[in-house]
């Protein structure tokens, strides 16, 4: 590697460029050729290597052949439907269950509008949106884990 000259931060032209936000990286370093020729291929090849490595180390099994006459005791949906499945399973009234299930995307739709006047991107400076996100994540994990358990242990996760 060659010797890299450090920029002179006392240079008024460079200070004006940095004040305007010009440049992609530190000190106004351009994205071409550094990012596009070095960082992006490394990230792409690293991602491909991770996927190939996981496919070799943990191959997915085909499983046993389907038998239409042997129905499992409880049919579970795909993992990303576990929280709403748990809502439908535990709420006694079907209409209330459907309304609660419909409130999930409506609640997600309102999250960007919480504190939208706040210009900060730091989560610690946006307490309402951060709290809603953390509580929503905890509830989704709780419902998702509970959906994999029997119905009598699903709400308490078998802890109580």
Swiss-Prot record:
| Molecular function terms, GO-annotated | electron transporter, transferring electrons within cytochrome b6/f complex of photosystem II activity; electron transporter, transferring electrons within the cyclic electron transport pathway of photosynthesis activity; oxidoreductase activity
Superkingdom classification of source: Eukaryota
Any idea where this protein resides? Plastid, Chloroplast thylakoid membrane
GO cellular component terms, alphabetically, are:
chloroplast thylakoid membrane
Native organism: Acorus calamus
Residues annotated as transmembrane: 36-56, 95-115, 131-151
Task: Give me the disulphide-bonded residues.
Answer: none
Gene Ontology biological process? photosynthetic electron transport chain
**Task of the protein:** Component of the cytochrome b6-f complex, which mediates electron transfer between photosystem II (PSII) and photosystem I (PSI), cyclic electron flow around PSI, and state transitions.
Q: Which gene encodes it?
A: petD
Read off the CDD domains from this record.
cytochrome_b_C (cd00290)
The protein's UniProt keywords, in alphabetical order, are: Chloroplast, Electron transport, Membrane, Photosynthesis, Plastid, Thylakoid, Transmembrane, Transmembrane helix, Transport
Per its record, how is this protein called by name?
Cytochrome b6-f complex subunit 4
Task: Give the record's subunit note.
Answer: The 4 large subunits of the cytochrome b6-f complex are cytochrome b6, subunit IV (17 kDa polypeptide, petD), cytochrome f and the Rieske protein, while the 4 small subunits are petG, petL, petM and petN. The complex functions as a dimer.
Concerning Gene3D superfamilies, the annotation shows: plastocyanin oxidoreductase, Single helix bin
Name the family the entry cites.
Answer: Belongs to the cytochrome b family. PetD subfamily.
Q: Which Pfam families does the entry link to?
A: Cytochrom_B_C
SUPFAM superfamilies registered for this protein in UniProt: a domain/subunit of cytochrome bc1 complex (Ubiquinol-cytochrome c reductase) (SSF81648)
The keyword Repeat appears for this protein = no
Could you tell me the membrane topology recorded for this protein?
Answer: Multi-pass membrane protein
């Amino acid at each position: 590697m060659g010797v890299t000259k450090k920029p002179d931060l006392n240079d008024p032209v460079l200070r004006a460029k940095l004040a305007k936000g010009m440049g992609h990286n530190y000190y106004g370093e351009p994205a071409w050729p550094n990012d596009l020729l070095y960082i992006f291929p490394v990230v792409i090849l690293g991602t491909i290597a991770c996927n190939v490595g996981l496919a070799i180390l943990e191959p997915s099994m085909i499983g046993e052949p389907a038998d239409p006459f042997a129905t499992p005791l409880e049919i579970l949906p795909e993992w990303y439907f576990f929280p709403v499945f748990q809502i439908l399973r535990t709420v006694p009234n079907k209409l209330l269950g459907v309304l609660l299930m419909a409130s999930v995307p409506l609640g997600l739709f309102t999250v960007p509008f919480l504190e939208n006047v706040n210009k900060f991107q730091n989560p610690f400076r946006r307490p309402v949106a951060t709290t809603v996100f953390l509580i929503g994540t905890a509830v989704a994990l709780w419902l998702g884990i509970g959906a994999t358990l029997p119905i009598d242990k699903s709400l308490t996760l078998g802890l109580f």
